Amino acid sequence: MLATVFLNLIKRAFMKKLLFQFDTDLHPSVFDTVVGYDGGADHVIGHGSLTPENIAALVDGTIFTRAPKDKKNTAIFVGGSDMAAGQILFEAVQKHFFPGFQVSVMLDSNGSNTTAAACVAKLASSGILTGKKAVILAGTGPVGQRAAAMLAMEGAEVTITSRQLWNAEKACEAMQKRFNVHIHAQAAADFDERAAAIQDANIVIATGATGVELLKPEHWQNNAALEMLADANATPPLGIGGIGVMDKGIDCQGKIVWGAIGFGALKLALHRACIAQLFEDNKHVLDAENIFALAKKMA
């Protein structure tokens, strides 16, 4: 009897931590797989092209296979390049849960939650966000939208720019619906329009496409209103000319600046910490709000 109990305790102590990677893209993200292992998963099992219509059996497999006290060793990570599709899938996964039968789940499509949270948390550690005017340049992508929402939740007055006004308005509406925050939309199709968009801004974050320069040094370095800038682009040419990719809250022309790798170390540490948290119990639901809260503690 005692031997059986002891054997069961040993089995539980060495029970494998399984992370099921639910990706909306055809091929699950290699980046997310690597960080899943680095975050403490023993095995990462990726599934691609997932939708609310084809996940039922997969979710059932996670919630019905282990005893209640062992369910914490199974978790789900929702990813993919499409944030909107990821949000829908994330919510669909949870609809299959019921009392006693659930596992922890995290949403980080395109790295949007962890990247935005790390960026805004580093800005928050560098200065005051409440009451400041913030502009997210080319902010209609996953990272830009989430960063805008997080800044708004911190009390900043936020504007998202895009080459097309309708695209910026669409992003603002999505964030208002999801987070109940008000964000302004503004068209800014070229250097001059983007320089005009940040004229009165205190905070600027560039979240444009890889290798696209959004501002040149002369567009921001002499702007007396600007206090902090962050560039999420790590591939030359960088999003904001004059900011180094490795910059970590340094003073540049009287402004505090952060480069993509400068706050990227926090992004990776945060991502790993969230994965580890998934295996603490089976009831964690990690999305923008609690991921951002953790980022601020880690910053």
Functional labels for PLM-detected ranges:
Residues 2-100, 290-299:
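N-terminal ligand-binding/catalytic initiation module
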Residues 29, 49-53, 84-88, 114, ...:
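Conserved active-site and cofactor/substrate-binding residues in soluble primary-metabolism enzymes
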Residues 98-106, 252-254:
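Glycine/charged-rich beta-loop-alpha catalytic/anionic-binding loops adjacent to active sites
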Residues 106-124:
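A glycine-rich, Thr/Ser-enriched phosphate-binding loop motif common to dinucleotide/cofactor-binding enzymes
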Residues 109, 137-138, 223:
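Alpha-helical transmembrane segments of multi-pass membrane proteins, especially transporters
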Residues 125-199, 203:
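Glycine-rich phosphate/diphosphate-binding loop of Rossmann-like nucleotide-binding domains
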Residues 183-257:
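Rossmann-like adenosine-cofactor binding region
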Residues 235-299:
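Adenosine-phosphate binding glycine-rich loop
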